[in-house]
Amino acid sequence: MQITVMKGKIHRATVTDADLNYEGSLTVDMDLVDAAGMRVYEKVSVVNINNGARFETYIIEGKRGSGEICLNGAAARLGMKGDKIIVITYAQVEENELPIDYIPKVVHVDENNRKR
């Protein structure tokens, strides 16, 4: 039987911009994408800590080292610059193939979205 598990998480990232007129997605600094084991165009769940909004979108490439976290398109209505968010990816795995000691990649960031 397959189960869905958390694969990676960027925890308490600060939204640096929100662009309503951009084609939908979430722009993320590639340093954070790599650190969390995520991929460009991968589906993500986003949780806005400030307002409780939860939504799904996909990642697009942000400039390395920029700390960029930008809500694009309709997602820009669900958060604003300065909000804290959690970005989560999931994977489906065979339950009997998941190691007992499995640990997803979790990236904690500072107020400038730099990996701690």
UniProtKB/Swiss-Prot annotation:
Disulfide bonds: none
Alphabetical list of SUPFAM superfamilies matching this protein: ADC-like
Keywords: Autocatalytic cleavage, Cytoplasm, Decarboxylase, Lyase, Pantothenate biosynthesis, Pyruvate, Schiff base, Zymogen
Signal sequence, renumbered to the chain: none
Manner of cofactor binding, per the entry note: Binds 1 pyruvoyl group covalently per subunit.
Pfam families: Asp_decarbox
HAMAP family linked to this entry: PanD
Modification(s) after translation: Is synthesized initially as an inactive proenzyme, which is activated by self-cleavage at a specific serine bond to produce a beta-subunit with a hydroxyl group at its C-terminus and an alpha-subunit with a pyruvoyl group at its N-terminus.
Subcellular location: Cytoplasm
Catalytic residues (positions): S25 (schiff-base intermediate with substrate), Y58 (proton donor)
Gene3D superfamilies: 2.40.40.20
Essential cofactor(s): pyruvate
Protein name per the record: Aspartate 1-decarboxylase
Positions where Pyruvic acid (Ser) occurs in the chain: S25
GO cellular component, one term: cytosol
Source organism (scientific name): Leptospira borgpetersenii serovar Hardjo-bovis (strain JB197)
Residues reported to bind substrate: T57, G73, A74, A75
